[in-house]
Regions:
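A structural boundary/capping signal
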Residues: 1-129
Length: 129
C-alpha cells in the first residue's frame, strides 16, 4: 500500500520551476532494490514535491507494471516524470515520459543525453493526486 502525503499549500508549477525542483531533488539517486521499486520512487518524489510546494500526482501504468509521477504545469500542461533509479544507485536518472493509452511508454533523460524505451504499451492509467 502506498500512502501519499499532500500539502494544502502545494500549487501547480511552471515547467521551469518543476525542472529546478527535479535538479535539486535526489530521489533518482536512491538504488533500485527488491524492496524499493518504481512505486516507492514515485511516492518519494510525490511527497518531496508536495513538501516543497509543488502539486504532484502518482501514476500507475497498467500494461507496463510501472509507476511514475505527473505534474500539471501552468505553461506546458501535463508532464510525466519518472525518477526510478538503478540497482546500486546512479545520478541523473530523471526522465520525462511520453504517456498515452494504447502507445508505447517512451521518454528522454532530463539532465543527460539519451532516450528511454520501456518496452511496454500503456493499457490505462491510475492517477492519484
Amino acid at each position: 500500500i502506498i500512502t501519499l502525503t499532500n500539502y494544502n499549500n502545494a500549487v501547480n508549477p511552471t515547467y521551469d520551476q518543476l525542472i529546478e525542483f527535479l535538479k535539486a531533488d535526489k530521489t533518482d539517486e536512491k538504488p533500485y532494490t527488491s524492496t524499493y521499486v518504481c512505486s516507492d520512487f514515485a511516492k518519494t518524489l510525490h511527497d518531496s514535491a508536495e513538501k516543497n510546494g509543488i502539486s504532484a500526482g502518482w501514476v500507475g501504468a497498467r500494461g507496463c507494471n510501472h509507476a511514475f509521477n505527473v505534474f500539471q504545469t501552468t505553461d506546458q500542461g501535463t508532464i510525466y516524470i519518472d525518477c526510478t533509479g538503478m540497482p546500486g544507485g546512479a545520478t541523473l536518472q530523471d526522465k520525462q515520459l511520453n504517456v498515452a493509452v494504447g502507445q508505447p511508454l517512451t521518454g528522454k533523460y532530463l539532465f543527460r543525453s539519451g532516450t528511454v524505451q520501456m518496452g511496454c504499451t500503456v493499457d490505462n492509467l491510475l492517477v492519484y493526486w
